[in-house]
Regions:
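Bacterial N-terminal signal peptides that target proteins for export
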Residues: 1-8
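Zinc-dependent metalloendopeptidases
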Residues: 19-244
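Bacterial N-terminal signal peptides
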Residues: 9-16
């Protein structure tokens, strides 16, 4: 996934647009002719993913995007963000999906073995990308996802401000809402594609005014993993968890 000229566009060869329930406000991610998800290769079944935030140069790479990744320190320094702020925005992005569906994220004990890596691009390009590595599930409708990477361009300016960026002083530069972009890219890693130009968090048109998952986003993630066991699947507003 790439953000360019105000729009989010898929920047990959193999991530094809899947024609799955677009009329319901979501589209499932199709790879090699199969929809993809974590956990059991069956719709409506939950999953748990370990994650790690990359701290420095990494040998890990994606199969299409995020081919060279590194730690987020340069990104934080350029945007004037602390590690605590970054962790809070990431927790809020995870929380959007956890509050809607039976999906759970937990810190990996061994970062090298994490299911999902959060990193910066070592060769900065675009704004943000997601990479998904599928594992064959024996000809079923779904292929299981084996690995995911989200990588952000450290040369862009990132904001951890609560609420839309409207009214924020702009000094000849464009800021991207870290929480929004992380949540969007995580949505790809979970198995969702772009359903439409606008209106959903997973839509490809960037909108810093969205405050959480929209009805189509929720319908899509629930179709993949079932509803959250803790909360009802209703549109939610992401909370700022920094400092907790």
């Amino acid at each position: 996934m790439r953000i360019s000229s105000g729009f989010l566009a898929v920047a990959t060869v193999c991530l094809a647009l899947a024609a799955a329930n677009a009329g319901d406000g979501y589209r499932l991610l199709e790879m090699n002719g199969h929809d993809v998800k974590w956990g059991i290769a069956k719709s409506g079944t939950g999953a748990s993913l370990s994650y790690a935030v990359v701290a420095g140069p990494s040998a890990s790479s994606g199969i299409n995007n995020c081919r060279a990744i590194t730690g987020v320190n340069t990104l934080l320094a350029r945007s004037g963000l602390s590690a605590l702020q970054f962790d809070g925005e990431l927790a809020a992005a995870f929380g959007m999906w956890e509050n809607a569906a039976d999906i759970h994220f937990f810190p990996a004990k061994n970062p090298a073995a994490a299911d999902l890596l959060i990193a910066a691009e070592a060769a900065p390009d675009g704004v943000a990308y997601a990479d998904v590595t599928p594992a064959s599930s024996g000809g079923q409708r779904f292929d299981r996802i084996a690995k995911g990477i989200v990588c952000l361009n450290p040369q862009q300016f990132w904001s951890a401000a609560e609420g839309p960026l409207a009214g924020r002083p702009v000094i000849d530069r464009k800021s991207y809402r870290l929480r929004y972009v992380l949540a969007h890219e995580i949505g790809h890693v979970l198995g969702l594609d772009h359903p439409s130009p606008s209106g959903e968090l997973m839509s490809f048109e960037y909108s810093g005014r969205l405050e959480g998952l929209q009805p189509g986003d929720i319908a899509g993630i629930v179709a993949l993993y079932g509803p959250s066991r803790a909360r009802s699947a209703t549109p939610i507003v992401a909370l700022n968890l920094a400092g907790r």
